[in-house]
């Protein structure tokens, strides 16, 4: 039985669910879950939690992501990416803008921004996914969402051809960010229709492309009984949270029994959630949170016996 976090390289054409389904067959275990959906046409890092590590999948999702995308100015689509039907075209020429204009524009997207999610997305409105409305040719008001663009920059020259302009960007962002919406919004600010023509996730949950294995590689390693060495411990998925190392055996016992604590029993300031780590084994003991009605107390959220 495997336990840990496995960074998978999801190839284009597969859904995130396909990856989980195939892994369950390869590894012969049902206790597998991914950490955030990647669209079928997007390749890149998809961390998968196996065994006990499924309990930390939410925390892996919260750790942020990085992408490399191609923005295509001059044509918009129904899906905001290359898979959709054309909505609008407007010829783009090298006299319309230059790379300095693009760089200044990209700077304006840094920080907390508002996005309207694409109609072809899994965001739910009134209990129904937006893509379900879109497939039925129904329109529905989409809620604006705040997302965090930690960094964004151009990583290629501008390529003007066939009345369009293409360039690559790298984006570091928080969860819930739609890069294809970012591409269309870049076009709006330039005064042109636009879409995202290619996307690769280069980092997710602290895992990068070089950490990631294809399904074929995973199958081979499993057959050679050497896959466990490639799994990251579940503690890795909690590195985005503050932690305290516990040496005292009495306190360890209280934590594992799920007892409440007063904040002032610890030297560290506890603002929201805290991970207790066994000071001897370096294994996670529990995740605690501030008590919702008693600010001076912390209570267990997840205990790892």
From Swiss-Prot:
The active site is at 39 (nucleophile). Disulfide bonds: none annotated. The keyword tRNA processing applies. Belongs to the pseudouridine synthase TruB family. Type 1 subfamily. Responsible for synthesis of pseudouridine from uracil-55 in the psi GC loop of transfer RNAs. The gene is truB. InterPro entries: PsdUridine_synth_cat_dom_sf, PsdUridine_synth_N, tRNA_psdUridine_synth_TruB, TruB_C. This is tRNA pseudouridine synthase B. It is an enzyme of class 5 (isomerase). It comes from the Bacteria. One of its GO terms (biological process) is mRNA pseudouridine synthesis.
């Amino acid at each position: 039985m495997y336990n840990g976090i496995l960074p998978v390289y999801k190839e284009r054409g597969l859904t995130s669910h396909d990856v989980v389904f195939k892994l369950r067959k390869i590894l012969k275990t049902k206790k597998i879950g991914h950490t955030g959906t990647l669209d079928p046409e997007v390749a890149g890092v998809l961390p998968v939690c196996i065994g006990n590590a499924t309990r930390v999948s939410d925390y892996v999702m919260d750790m942020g992501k990085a992408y490399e995308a191609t923005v295509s100015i001059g044509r918009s689509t129904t899906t905001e990416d290359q898979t959709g039907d054309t909505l609008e075209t407007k010829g783009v020429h090298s006299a319309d803008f230059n790379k300095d204009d693009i760089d200044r524009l990209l700077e304006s997207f840094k920080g907390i921004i508002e996005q309207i999610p694409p109609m072809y997305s899994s965001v739910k409105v009134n209990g129904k996914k937006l893509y379900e409305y879109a497939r039925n040719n129904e329109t529905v008001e989409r809620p604006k969402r705040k997302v965090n663009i930690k960094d964004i920059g151009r990583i290629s020259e501008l390529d003007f051809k066939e009345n369009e302009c293409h360039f690559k960007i790298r984006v570091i962002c928080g969860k819930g960010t739609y890069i294809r919406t970012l591409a269309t919004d870049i076009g709006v600010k330039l005064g042109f229709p636009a879409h995202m023509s290619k996307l690769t996730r280069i980092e997710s949950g602290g895992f990068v492309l070089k950490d990631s294995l294809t399904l074929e590689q995973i199958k081979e390693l499993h057959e050679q009984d050497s896959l466990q060495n490639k799994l990251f411990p579940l503690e890795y998925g909690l590195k985005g949270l503050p932690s305290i190392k516990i040496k005292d055996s009495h306190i360890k016992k209280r934590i594992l029994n799920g007892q409440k604590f007063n904040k002032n029993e610890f030297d560290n300031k506890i603002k929201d959630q805290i991970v207790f780590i066994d000071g001897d084994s370096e294994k996670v003991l529990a995740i605690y949170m501030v008590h919702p009605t008693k600010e001076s107390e912390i209570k267990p959220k997840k205990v790892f016996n």
